[in-house]
Each structure stands twice: as structure tokens, then as C-alpha cells.
Curated annotation (Swiss-Prot):
The active site is at E148, E307. It comes from Lactobacillus acidophilus. The keyword Hydrolase applies. GO terms for cellular component: beta-galactosidase complex. Keywords: Glycosidase, Hydrolase, Metal-binding, Zinc. Zn(2+) binds at C113, C153, C155, C158. It comes from the Bacteria. InterPro entries: Beta_galactosidase_C, Beta_galactosidase_Trimer, Class_I_gatase-like, Glyco_hydro_42, Glyco_hydro_42_N, Glyco_hydro_b, Glycoside_hydrolase_SF. CDD domains: A4_beta-galactosidase_middle_domain (cd03143). The gene is lacA. This is Beta-galactosidase LacA. It is an enzyme of class 3 (hydrolase).
Amino acid sequence: MTQLSRFLYGGDYNPDQWPEETWSKDIHVFKKADINSATINIFSWALLEPREGKYNFSKLDKVVQQLSDANFDIVMGTATAAMPAWMFKKYPDIARVDYQDRRHVFGQRHNFCPNSSNYQRLAGELEKQLVERYKDNKHIVFWHINNEYGGNCYCENCQNAFKKWLKNKYKTVEGLNKAWNMNVWSHTIYDWDEIVVPNELGDVWGIKGSETIVAGLSIDYLRFQSESMQNLFKMEKKIIKKFDPETPVTTNFHGLPNKMVDYQKWAKGQDIISYDSYPTYDAPAYKAAFLYDLMRSLKHQPFMLMESAPSQVNWQPYSPLKRPGQMEATEFQAVAHGADTVQFFRLKQAVGGSEKFHSAVIAHSQRTVTRVFKELADLGKKLKNAGPTILGSKTKARFAIVFDWSNFWSYEYVDGITQDLNYVDSILDYYRQFYERNIPTDIIGVDDDFSNYDLVVAPVLYMVKHGLDKKINDYVENGGNFVTTYMSGMVNSSDNVYLGGYPGPLKEVTGIWVEESDAVVPGQKIKVLMNGKDYDTGLICNLIHPNDAKILATYASEFYAGTPAVTENQYGKGRAWYIGTRLEHQGLTQLFNHIIFETGVESLVCDSHKLEITKRVTEDGKELYFVLNMSNEERTLPSKFTGYEDILTGEKAHKDMKGWDVQVLRN
């Protein structure tokens, strides 16, 4: 990671929406909360370039000067995420076309075509002006390119670029026809010009484009769109580095996670990962923790929490206030899992337009006596005290869960068996097992090095690309422990089924083959017998034939009662477990008691008392334990931490932890 000089505490600031005479007062209020940074210029293109080639930086100059004079660290946006009206009028091809074949008009945001040469040219020209102007300002500590990339395009620009992309990948139409199995429904093509991008009028349907005739086409198009947006990022980054090679560059990732953009491929081009976090009020705490661990694992370094909400979120269906203490707990949860900044959207609440009811440091009341502001100021004080100690510390994990965007896409395109396949939910079933045991866990991709881990869990590894099976076999043969599940090893990278029984190329390492897969309909429960107890299961039940594997659990109902549901296979020096059904939480917990015991890895704390406990290690080897009560109920601090120091307060650790309480402890 690019080393920060201090722990950034701040967020998005939009002074261009306010009279100039209010800016100095805003900065004074921010300082009262120990805020030391501001993210600016994210959506200012219309102000900076009111007409093509006519630039006006006068207002931004003043904003930068005032923040610099106040010794704020500045995260400088490139303003390319929302386009001015004149651009739509003069260059209609810049507007993206949705999968229903409708071209967007001026309005909203995230509505540019990534393959529009006009958008690329105009964004590059603005970028050059911006970077040349501010490259020598030492208060600018990060360049923030665009904003929350997303929104696929299906226009003629993209269609032409997609054909070139396919030619480069498949070389011949014969190769493409074979990869996509285009003999189905007479889809065979004989010329590259016959390719049509997937859309509702062609091979995709459903409200969200969730159904597809040719999955290979749709998956390749998602890969292509992710690369197209990534190329825009690379273009802007190249311009920045030409004039300012030292200041690090990022763009903010978002979502649960964002399905449209393959962040694992993008991560290589980021100087630092940044993430926008907005958990819903009813989301379990482990879901946010998973996303933070994913962001940390993208570069195996601390990341930036680029956006979060002080209290209410504007766009969710229901946005209750964050309860007293909850804001601090949720922000420290990000820090506990690897964040080296705490930043909000936004610093000052807007009076109009979209997101005007989204919470902020300066609320509509414009008072500093409010509950939220007092909590923000208290958080600022704690970060000021503890930030230097936390900054740059890392998480060391011996367990890993595999998350892969090609599997994300292909798994949810499955046509048949059941409509209830949800990739993220399936991954979370397994992440929760480690979260509740306070076992540090990395979220890795299929290209990461498995040998760094004692246990690798790859749930619903539906798509196994060429070479991945050998990588898994080698890992287990050399002593690794591997877990996979139903809906794994079924197709290749073009979504064509492996023959010979599921899990295809994973049959050898798992020591089993699957004959059929039964769909469990809503409201139906299938029983699984494990260690003399019955457990409920659902979604899918694989009918398993063990070859070399031993049986750990069997079905206890339906016509396949008595057949294997869970198996364990010794393979070389290691072991592979196959879980042929979606065990409910109690049953999965019982199974993972066995699996984790076999690995020899222990929890950070055995008597966690329903507290979330994570650990970061400083460069000089000091261990920092983050103890979070992610509920409104009182909990008890584990006895292990008796006598430890809470670096947030400088006092000894306290035993009774009220709702949403946080301690960061060192011995």
C-alpha cells in the first residue's frame, strides 16, 4: 500500500453546491470533529467545462486553496463520472444503450458508453487540464478516477468493439461456434458481422437480464464490458501518471459486491483499493465484514473506506437512523478488517436534488449540538489517538474462501434445476462459519496462490477454467485442505458442461461423482443425518457415488435416503470435502467443527461471547485486537483480554461491553 502519513478522516465535500462565503465556516466545523481530509470534484464536469474546450477552474482553485490552507488532505476527483448536457446534445453516441435497446438521454449518472471515442477524448482532455493544474499541490494525496464504475452498454460502439474482442479471443468463427455451442437452436454464425450483443430483443430476457439462451455469449459480454470500463480507468490513470507519477491513484469500488465489474482483475491497476460501504439496516454484520475482507484481499493490503454514511442512507427502501453508538461500531468494523481511512458521503447535506436526505457531518440543522455530530467528533478524537498505531497494520489469514466473478456471472445464468441460485448468499454461508469463530479469512480469486493457506473453501465453484483443477489437485496433494460443494466443477470457461459426471475435473480430488441433482422446492425440507443427529437442508441435493471418499453425512429422507450428502477424501498429503447440499446453518456449523479441527487452526478467542473479534499486526509485530459488539445487547469481554490497554482511550480494557461498544486492545 502507498503509505499514508496519517489516518484519513473525512469524506465527500461539494462546496460548489454552496455559496463561497460558507466554505470557511464548513471547514471550521469539520475541524471540530477532527476531520482532516476531503474528497472533492467528483461530479463537477459541467462547472469545469461549461462548453466544449472552454474550461473554468476558478471555483475549484478557491476550494483547493482553502482546504490546503487548513492543512486538509485532498482526494481529488477527476469529475468524469457525470457528463454535462452539451455533451449529450453534441455527441449522442456517448450515452449508453441499455439491454432493452434504449439509448439514455441527459440525466442521472453512470450513463456513458465506455467504447465511445468521443467520451474517451473529452474525458482525457479534461483530465489533462486538471492534472497539469494541480499536480504540484502536496495536499492532494490521492487522485480519484471517475466514480463507482458500472452500467453496461449495448450500443453500436460496443457491438463493434465486442466483435474485435471476440476475434482476438477465438481467432475464427469456427472457434467461437464451438466455444459457445452455437448449433443449439440454429445459432451457428458464419461471419463476425452476424454477432449480436446480448439484449432483451435477442438472447437475453427477464427484468434484469437474468436469463440467457447462449450463456457463453452473455458471460463473454460481461467480461468484455468489465474490460471496457477498466480501459477507461487505465486511460485516465496513464494521463495522471504522465504529469504526476508520485501521487497514488484509485477508483471507488462498491456494491455487494458490484456484479458488473471484475474487481480482482481491476485490482492490479489500483495503487490502493477503495470501497463505498452502505449496509442495509437489516443486513447481518458478517455480510459487511465479508465485503471488507474481500476489499483487503484484492491486494492483500489495507484499503480505503472511501464512502459510508454517518446515519441514514438516501436510496435504500427503508433507512432507519443508526442507533446511538452504531455509527462508530460500523466504521470500526471496516478498520478492523483492513481499512486505513474512514470517509463519509457526505460532509455537508445537500438542500436539493438526489440524495438530499442522505446523512452528513453538517446536517440540514447546521448545528453541532446534535447526537450524530457529537458521535462523529468522538470518533474523530479516537481515530486521532489510535490512527498512527493502526495505520499500515495488516491481517494474517490461514483460511481462504474463493470468490470469482466468472463464477458469479455463470452461476446466476444457470437455466434449470432451481431459480433460487444466488452466488453471494452461497459464499456467505461459508464465510459466516469463520466469522462466528473469529478466524481471520482472506477472500481470494482462482488465480491467487492457494499454498499460502491451511484451508481453501470454494463454494459453488460452478465454472472450472482450464488448469484450475490441476492447481487444486496439487494444493491438496501437497497437504492442503480443500472444501467444495454442490454446483461445482460443472462447466468450463465457456459454460459448456464437463462430461463423465459432476463435479467434472474435481472428481479425482473429491473422490466422488454426482449422478443427479434434486431441486428442493420452497417450503420443503430434506433431512441429513450427521453424527447421529438430523439437520435440515435445502436448495439442491446431489445424489453422490463415492469412489475413494468416506461418508460423513447421509440423506435421511426422500428416495435417496441413506446415500451420501457429505464426503471426505484423503488425496496425497491433504484432504478434500464435498458438501452435496445446502446445509442450514446448524448443520454446517457441526460439519465445520470437524473440518476446522482437522486443520489445526484455532480461533483468535474461544470464548468470544458473540463479539466480533479481529486482529491486525503492525510492522513491528504488535498485535491489535479489535473487539466489536455489533448488536444493541450488552456483551462480556473475553477473559483473555484482562489487563489489555484500549488504544482508543488509553485506559484498561473494560469487561462489560454495552450495545455497539468498541475496544481496540493491545497487551
